Amino acid sequence: MMMIVLVFLFGCAGVPVRPALKEEIGVPPGKIDGNQFTGIRYPFEVSVPPHWKMTTEFPDFMVELGYERPDPTDKEQTELYAYNPETKSNINFDMTPAGRHDRFSQKMIESLTASVTGNIKSDLEKERGKGVANIEIGPTEPISLKGVQYAAKKHVTYTLKGQKREQGWIYGFMEPYQIFILYTILEKEGVNDRQDMKKILDSFEVITKK
């Protein structure tokens, strides 16, 4: 997806802080039961409002919103897509193992989250054309997610073809996983996707094995 390609996989020399893990794309992402998702590939749960839909397959409409259709052979695979069929507002969840040497702190998470906005204006115009207007970049903020040690959020708002949009990204870490959450809100009169999005994020939880 245009400028919001969260590639925060990095490494540094030194003593390993965790065993080497790999992305198990052969394992099913998880189980959808009504409006509840329970992860199998990675240990997280999330629920959506009744009028939203969830799928582990890439929704076709997201190509028009700037997302690239993933290749089945990609080493990184998004575990869950959730969206409002009426407005096409959506939120997508991905987890991936952290590298053996990667170390995390809240300060570092916030710094990496903020760094994504470096070329955001030019990237938006390249992806959407010159019709993009009123681009505003929001602050980098810590965010509390259940079962997550460190997390930060940032967003950008803009207008395209008379419609206001918000695109945001959340980057988090809970040993031994990195967490990537991308969302898009397409505003429509009479629909409160922003409130729905908050409920979805409030329901998200990384389950710690006991």
Ranges and model annotations:
Residues D94, H155-T157, T184:
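Residue-level recognition of well-ordered beta-strand positions that form the cores
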Residues M1-C12:
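Sec-dependent bacterial lipoprotein signal peptides
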Residues F10-T87, N134-E136, I143-L145, L160-R165, ...:
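N-terminal targeting sequences that direct proteins away from the cytosol to non-cytosolic compartments
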Residues N90-N92, A151-K153, Q178-F180:
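Short hydrophobic-acidic sequence motifs that mark active-site Asp/Glu residues
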Residues P16-D33, M95-G99, T113-K126, S144-Y150:
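Short N-terminal helix-initiation segments at or just after the protein's N-terminus
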Residues T73-S115, L182:
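A short acidic-to-branched-hydrophobic micro-motif
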Residues V46-P49, N92-M95, W169-I170:
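Short amphipathic beta-strand/extended segments with alternating polar/hydrophobic composition
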Residues Q106, E110-F173:
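Signature of long, low-cysteine stretches enriched in small and polar/charged residues
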